[in-house]
A protein has these predicted regions:
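Terminal-region recognition feature
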Residues: 1-139
Length: 139
């Protein structure tokens, strides 16, 4: 692959990312679709920052709508998203909408929405379980 092709692909990816960021700011809608991972956590946290603190506008901001469909994932990343949502709710409402399935780590993210603004679809499955951990092997 030549450097020119790589530069063109990077430029196209950058333009697409900028377009998505711009549209996201206008419609104030985010989504967590799939597993809660470090990459998705980073995207959601940065999105929340862009729609609140970094937007350059003064609070109160228009509400943010967050769609969630996940089997769960990393508890550490979930708590990062939860903490940022808690901070963002000081400046605007966050409307959470469960679609399809909201399970495990996704349930706390769904519950982190503004009271009275948390919804699930008619056919959405929600599952929560106790947290446990363990280790195996010699110490």
């Amino acid at each position: 692959m030549s450097n020119d092709t790589t530069k063109e692909e990077t430029s196209t990816e950058d333009k697409l990312s900028e377009l998505i960021d711009s549209v996201s700011q206008e419609i104030r809608t985010m989504a967590l679709i799939g597993d809660v991972t470090e990459e998705k956590s980073t995207d959601l946290i940065m999105g929340l920052l862009m729609l609140t603190d970094l937007s350059g506008n003064e609070p109160p901001y228009d509400p943010i709508k967050m769609y969630i469909s996940t089997y769960g994932g990393s508890a550490d990343e979930m708590f990062g998203i939860y903490d940022m949502m808690t901070k963002a709710k000081q400046q605007c409402e966050i409307h959470t909408v469960g679609i399809g399935k909201v399970m495990s780590a996704g349930t706390l993210i769904l519950a982190a929405g503004t009271k009275g603004k948390r919804l699930i679809g008619k056919n959405c499955r929600v599952m929560i379980h106790s947290v446990n951990a363990g280790s195996v092997g010699e110490l």
